A protein has these predicted regions:
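Short, positively charged, Gly/Tyr-enriched micro-motifs
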Residues: 67-163
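Short, conserved DNA-binding cores of transcription-related domains
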Residues: 1-76
Length: 164
């Protein structure tokens, strides 16, 4: 996956979703090649801070250098989470009143537990990516997601967070 900070969206009436276009140069985070070709789109749904369902069409790109396929994610998307980054930050910072309606205590507890485990994981991985950017468990969620996703260190399961 490639996480981008600069992007724009274009809404498509017939798809009922927004295409996400990167506004910054893309490069493969495995081989650092900038020779990427568009390979299609993938649908991704998010729940926003105000409780709306946001449907995004995420671009897939193929690296001609190493043959890997990457998803180009905007930094508002936290990989493998159903809420957008702004909603997760509101929960983490203890502002559940900003969180979407219908978010129960169990879900709030689950997000906070994930973030606690993520803090330990970030502490262990920060040394590995220190030459790219300085991140700590106190860094903003956007910076942590971008750094770890682009370094291919984003944990796919909770067991990865707790390992080591």
């Amino acid at each position: 996956m490639i996480n981008v900070k600069e992007y724009h969206t274009e809404y498509s009436e017939d798809k009922r979703a927004s295409y996400v276009w990167a506004d910054e140069p893309l490069s493969c985070s495995f081989c650092d090649s900038s020779d990427l070709i568009r390979k299609g789109w993938r649908s991704r749904k998010l729940i926003t801070l105000i409780g709306n369902l946001l449907c995004l069409l995420i671009q897939r790109v193929l690296c001609k250098g190493c043959g890997r396929i990457h998803h180009v994610l905007p930094d508002m998307v936290v990989p493998y989470k159903r809420y957008d980054a702004e909603t997760i930050e509101a929960i983490i910072e203890g502002e559940p009143e900003k969180a979407p309606c219908g978010l129960d205590e169990t879900e709030i507890h689950r997000v906070k537990a994930w973030w606690r485990d993520m803090g330990f994981y970030v502490s262990r991985k920060a040394a590995s990516v220190a030459n790219k950017i300085q991140i700590t468990p106190n860094s903003k969620l956007h910076a942590i997601v971008r750094t770890l996703a682009n370094a291919h260190m984003w944990p796919r399961t909770r067991s990865v967070l707790l390992a080591e």
